């Protein structure tokens, strides 16, 4: 059994700056444990889009309520990306648990917390180590904003909210 503090064969431990002899931005998803209760995110399978985020505490999400669940992690995602916290399908389907406010910008270095919403009529118990959400790293485009007098015409025009069918 491997020591908990040792990186797994697939995880690389980087120096403080994440640089290995060059100054190019690191392509790695960097994770810092803020306590011994933090669980390093993992993917459920080689083709999984999301990294599972785990609770660092025992907690409760009240019926029809919400709770902020700490992960005791800080992260750094590659430049040109952001991290999105998304629901886990099993929690959504079986327990009516959803997540909110799930954007983590590439320059944020604070603790990662997960806002859980309970849409059911029963309290939802969260235990230390439970996988509560998934973190998906997505590429982002941030073009300059240009104010214009008119927008280009399209077939759809200003039709919204069901205008293309139900």
Curated annotation (Swiss-Prot):
Record's protein name: Deoxyuridine 5'-triphosphate nucleotidohydrolase
Cofactor note: Binds 1 Mg(2+) per trimer.
Assembly, per entry: Homotrimer.
Reaction(s) the record says it catalyses: dUTP + H2O = dUMP + diphosphate + H(+)
Cofactor: Mg(2+)
Regions annotated as coiled coil: none
Annotated region (Disordered), positions in chain: 1-24
Organism: Arabidopsis thaliana
GO biological process, one term: dUMP biosynthetic process
More info: Silencing of DUT leads to high seedling mortality and affects plant growth and flower organ morphology in surviving plants.
Gene3D superfamilies linked to this entry: 2.70.40.10
Function: This enzyme is involved in nucleotide metabolism: it produces dUMP, the immediate precursor of thymidine nucleotides and it decreases the intracellular concentration of dUTP, preventing uracil incorporation into DNA.
UniProt: Mg(2+) binding residues: 138
Pathway(s) of this molecule: Pyrimidine metabolism; dUMP biosynthesis; dUMP from dCTP (dUTP route): step 2/2
Enzyme class: hydrolase
This protein's UniProt keywords: Hydrolase, Magnesium, Metal-binding, Nucleotide metabolism
Cross-referenced InterPro entries: dUTPase, dUTPase-like, dUTPase-like_sf, dUTPase_trimeric
EC number of this enzyme: 3.6.1.23
Family: Belongs to the dUTPase family.
Pfam families listed in its UniProt record: dUTPase
Superkingdom classification of source: Eukaryota
MF (Gene Ontology): dUTP diphosphatase activity; identical protein binding; magnesium ion binding
